Amino acid sequence: MSRVNTMHQWKERLRDRARTASFGRFLWRRFLDDRLFQAAASLAYTTVFALVPLAIVVFGVLSAFPAFNEWKDALTDFIFNNFVPGAARSVQNYLNRSLEDLGKFTVAGMVALVASLLITLHSIEQTFNSIWRVAAARPKVTRFLIYWTVLTLGTMLAAASMAMAAYVFALPLFRTTEGQWLAEFAWRLAPMAVEFVCIVLIYRVVPQHAVRLRHALPGALLAVILMEIVKWGFGFYLGNFQTYQRIYGALSALPILLLWIYLSWVSVLLGASLASSMSAFRYQPEAMRLPPGFEIYGLLRLLGRFRQARLHGNGLDEDRILALEPMLTDTLMQELLCELKRIRLLRRDERGNWLLARDLDVVPLAELYESCQLRVPVEDRPLPCRDDPYGQAAAAALEQLRQPLRSVLAQPVGDLYTHLPGDPP
């Protein structure tokens, strides 16, 4: 699909008031369900404890490459000048002293530092997996390799980018008045560009979920806008009010840093929730929605799709599943897939497609009923796509399950206790 068609599609969706209102309600529910403010508070505390080990890893990577040694101080100054409030700038001196005293750390101290860093990275991954409704995390080895790759390559790319920018801006073109103005504008824009690119990469890499670029970009844009508002608000407040300095004195840098980290995480997580909502939201007309309690109907249809795909030697990716079964929401689909994977009825291939792992002819219906814990609805309700072959098969199976229940559930509750001892004759 071309970019023009994609933009036209989004414009048409915005004009659809019902779709827009439905997405607004869906987004608000996701914000509440994700409990982002509590998650940001937890991440803020763990991030504070991980600052020193993170700095050790970052600058240790740069020290391993002599070509980047001269850029360590420039990278540090760039980070603290553009991303950290001025009142918390004293933290930079503390980090520098910690790096200078690195050789004095004991083995136990180094283990504690590495453990705090791994705990922070694990908490970040868990939070993003929760936002994207991912039930199963990556294997531990894969997780560690991703952490290490992000830290090392991210550090080298940041230093290389600064070196490249310095080389470009040293060209004769930028020595003119207009060129100097352009270079100054670029350096002013650089922090926001760095934030935007980093957040997009975080959304794409950290969660155990295939996040599309078209969903990550708006989420990252929202996060950057919120972070810039936070930085402006900090600058305005700290420049006009001296309450923190008066109350905490020399220790004022710590609460300011903690609050700044918390609000930064709130911004990043709100952007992540927007990106997750955009990928999970599917507008369903009333006739295409599963009635509450009829999830088992969707499960039976889903298994029919997998059976048909297996006959043709194919698997199904999640986009294909949602296209074939429009009554399934992304959340319900993820829940069903995770449950079927847990009982080893489904598995994923190397391309990420879902495949049947067992023959449905030897899987009793009772196993699905017990493991997935889905209710069997007694009442009859209009069901979407009931007239196609999968709907007919699922509806027939559902009817067989609930017929015996109807007669049992029709009796009065009092009849259950007519033969208790001690009752009057």
Swiss-Prot record:
Stretches that traverse the bilayer: 48-68, 105-125, 154-174, 182-202, 216-236, 250-270
Entry-linked InterPro entries: UPF0761_bac, Virul_fac_BrkB
Main localization (coarse): membrane
Pfam family, one: Virul_fac_BrkB
Intracellular or extracellular location(s): Cell inner membrane
Protein's membrane topology: Multi-pass membrane protein
Cellular component, GO, one term: plasma membrane
Keywords: Cell inner membrane, Cell membrane, Membrane, Transmembrane, Transmembrane helix
Signal peptide: none
Family listed: Belongs to the UPF0761 family.
HAMAP family per the UniProt record, alphabetical: UPF0761
Name of the protein in question: UPF0761 membrane protein XCC0860
